[in-house]
UniProtKB/Swiss-Prot annotation:
PANTHER family: CARBON DIOXIDE CONCENTRATING MECHANISM PROTEIN CCMM, CARBOXYSOME ASSEMBLY PROTEIN CCMM. Optimum pH is 8.0 - 9.5. This is Carboxysome assembly protein CcmM. The gene is ccmM. The lineage of its organism: Bacteria, Bacillati, Cyanobacteriota, Cyanophyceae, Nostocales. InterPro entries: CA_gamma_LbH (IPR047223), CcmM (IPR017156), Gamma-CA (IPR052265), Hexapep (IPR001451), RuBisCO_ssu_dom (IPR000894), RuBisCO_ssu_sf (IPR036385), Trimer_LpxA-like_sf (IPR011004).
């Protein structure tokens, strides 16, 4: 049943407009607008509030059994055409049995294949969506060809072909949802046709039919799927958790050369109020800095500190997400628990979690980011004096969470012994870090509280110094190892404001040749830069690269 709308308003193209060709079995609602050379196939439903204007770009084709829902806009540019399934050129081609849902925008040149589903408020512009694709809500598809049978999640922004090629395949539950929506609109079409037929509508009006409301909840979308094409599901879960906890979100980028020195540069500030806005801002940062490292961080605006740092893109591509991140059930508190994630990063508030300190987790993260291998060794008190260490089970893990689990297993197996963490350069086949993480009297205290006075001449240490030091025994061990390995030491500092941008300032290399002199210089730096972040740097003078970065003082 074809219904003609009111006359089109005058435009520069009005004089040469062709008449729309509408199949007699199609239903076009009186409150819709169809202008120009539009071919509408059999059993099509055009709902109220739609605007199909083939005046500037022309012609349009809408295949049989397609339903176009309320508020859909189909328009085309004067230039640009797509090739339809009949090998003719069209400004817009919509195939058979397709579904364009509420408020969708199809702007030509555009192609939507057979049995495709375009979700609410999604936009297709200068693009081709293959047959059998499902596009969920609020998505943008522009300047790409989406292969057939692909799933575009809600909020996705697909603007380059690499993104389109990486899209996941449609799953059965996605088809079920699309068929559910299409079924409702086919029922509407039958209802509209019945309403126009007095013989059909009269008996229904005379019947007293009790209405009911279904309590069944339809699964609208795959909750575990990627809700953004460029970002993993795990990153999205982290963003959602941070926003729910009232934290701010930021992002930083750095090229491969500066990554070694930790010279991160902030991306554009993210003022997002919703997950969708935050994801869009992150994707913009990824697009602007492809081929670089990009990391996401969360900020506690009250404590003015970071609660999360995780790398979401590496130069060889986006970090593959996993489902290992689990948002805590309650707000983060003072215990500063560490949460591992599939990107090989974690976040901590400076205390301990389980059997591994937050400082050890930071060291693990730095070693993995530098491409180093990680190992562990243990020794009892008697053999500690002779340095007869034994290796624990080899660690083949590539993420911080897996390494932490392996460390905890080693700690459980060798309670009452010394255990140390080893960083190994697989290319040079040498050690870049040796750090004791457990002593017979318990776990090594983290160095996140630089004000604590710790004696370096502890009975459990194999080497004694003449004076007490503000540094923790772990930092003293690191200084000893760096000097013993022939490396240089340096100090960097930064205030709280510049810490967010990673703008560290160096005090220059420490020229000390003995452990005592180096500790004295480090303590002088801590006093000079009280109230700032201070980190210790180990430098390989031959390879001219850093072998250690560890924060030894916080504000």
């Amino acid at each position: 049943m074809a219904v003609r709308s009111t006359a089109a308003p005058p435009t520069p193209w009005s004089r040469s407009l062709a008449e729309a060709q509408i199949h007699e079995s199609a239903f076009v609602h009186p409150f819709s607008n169809i202008i120009g050379d539009v071919h509408i196939g059999a059993n099509v439903i055009i709902a109220p509030g739609t605007s199909i204007r083939a005046d500037e770009g022309t012609p349009f084709h809408i295949g049989e059994n397609t339903n176009i829902q309320d508020g859909v806009v189909i328009h085309g540019l004067e230039q640009g055409r797509v090739v339809g399934d009949d090998n003719k050129e069209y400004s817009v081609w919509v195939g058979s049995s397709a579904s364009l849902t509420h408020m969708a925008l199809i702007h030509g040149p555009a192609y939507v294949g057979d049995n495709s589903f375009i979700g609410f408020r999604s936009t297709v512009f200068n693009a081709k969506v293959g047959a059998g694709c499902i596009v969920m809500m609020h998505a943008l598809i522009k300047d790409v060809e989406v292969p057939p049978g692909k799933y575009v999640p809600s909020g996705a922004i697909i603007t380059n072909q690499k993104q389109a090629d990486r899209l996941p395949d449609v799953q059965p539950q996605d088809r079920d949802f699309a068929h559910h929506v299409i079924g409702i609109n086919q029922a509407l079409r039958a209802g509209y046709l019945c309403a126009a037929d007095s013989k059909c509508i009269a008996p229904l009006r005379n019947d007293q039919v009790k209405s009911y409301t279904s309590t069944t909840v339809i699964g609208l979308e795959r909750s575990s799927e990627v809700a953004s094409n460029s970002l993993g599901a795990e990153t999205i879960e982290q963003v959602r958790y941070l926003l729910e906890q009232g934290y701010k979100i930021g992002s930083e980028h750095v090229d491969q050369r500066r990554f070694r020195t930790g010279s991160w540069t902030s991306c554009q500030p993210i003022e997002a109020r919703s997950v969708g806005d935050a994801l869009a801002a992150l994707e913009a940062c990824l697009a602007d800095h492809s081929g670089e490292y990009v990391r996401l961080f969360g900020i506690d605006p009250k404590g003015k500190r970071r609660v999360l740092e995780t790398i979401i893109q590496r130069p060889d591509g986006v970090v593959a997400g996993s489902t290992s991140f689990k948002a805590p059930a309650s707000n983060t508190n003072g215990n500063g628990s560490y949460h591992s994630n599939g990107n090989g990063n974690g976040y901590s508030n400076g205390a301990t979690s389980g059997k591994v300190s937050a400082e050890t987790v930071d060291q693990i993260r730095q070693l993995l980011a530098g491409g180093y291998k990680i190992g562990t060794e243990h020794v009892d008190e008697r053999r500690f004096r002779t340095g007869s260490w034994n290796s624990c089970k080899p660690i083949e893990a590539t993420s911080a969470g897996e390494v932490v689990a392996a460390l905890e297993e080693c700690i459980d197996s060798h309670q009452g012994e010394y255990i140390r963490l080893i960083g190994i350069d697989p290319k040079a086949k040498r050690r870049v870090l040796e750090s004791i993480i457990q002593r017979p009297n318990g776990q090594v205290a983290p160095s996140s509280s630089p004000r604590t006075v710790v004696s370096a001449s502890s009975a459990s240490s194999g080497t004694a110094t003449a004076t007490a030091t503000r540094l923790s025994t772990e930092v003293v061990d690191q200084v000893r190892q760096i000097l013993g390995g022939g490396y240089k030491l340096s100090i960097e500092h930064v205030d709280q404001r510049r810490f967010r941008t990673g703008s560290w300032s160096s005090t220059g290399a420490i020229s000390a040749t003995s452990e005592r002199e180096a500790i004295a210089v480090i303590e002088a730096s801590l006093s000079e830069f009280a109230g700032e972040y201070v980190r210790l740097i180990g430098i390989d003078p031959k390879a001219k690269r850093r072998v250690l970065e560890t924060i030894i003082q916080r504000p």
